[in-house]
Amino acid sequence: MHIPSCETAELELIRFAPALEEANRPSPDYDTERWLYVPNVYSEYRYILGTRGKHPLICIGINPSTAAPDHLDNTLKSVERIALYNGFDSFLMFNVYAQRATNPDDMELTYNAQLHQENLQAFDYILSLDQNSAPAIWAAWGTIIEKRPYLPPCVQDLIQLGKARHAVWYSAGKRSKKGHPHHPLYLRKDSVLEPFDASSYIAQLIQK
């Protein structure tokens, strides 16, 4: 379980670009040819965790917990199973907000603009990785998006980046009454990805 030790504004953030350089170098802790883990050390935030491939499924949750290479939590195990079932050769777990907190109630109340900007750079990078087609994005944040008022605008920024890369959005499982995409944890391993109109969804959410 991860409980934030401080506000992320109190940290000296590792910027995405140098963190990616480190993540692409050999590590004694895990196989860097299999895993993409940015930053490549456990910290109070995480930009990316996933497997390397030519046709990845990008899954977007709200915020990271404790998972690391070779130590996936149940949510990421589900993400990997569903990605493979739907014909992808790899998965990349990304989050609306990069702060680690196992309990979303522990997420910071004050949005850190610098952390978000670094996270956007990470997102644009993973959007560029699909070698076969337009990037595929699985919206999977569940109702947790209601936990903090800064989260929907963060999603809106991700949608804009996705448009520039001609990304295709999906969800899996039944959506909530308010239209939130289902969280991966309790989905069947044979869950099929369905088209998701992310732009209409976020426009309605921000209007409320």
Predicted regions and their residues:
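A short mixed-secondary-structure module that forms the rim of ligand-binding clefts
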Residues: 65-87
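Active-site and ligand/interface coordination hotspots across diverse enzymes
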Residues: 1-73
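Feature marks short, surface-exposed loop/turn motifs that line or immediately flank catalytic pockets
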Residues: 66, 100, 145
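Residues at the starts of beta-strands that form the adenosine-phosphate
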Residues: 56, 89-90, 136, 168
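Short acidic (Asp/Glu) patches
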Residues: 43, 72-80, 113-122
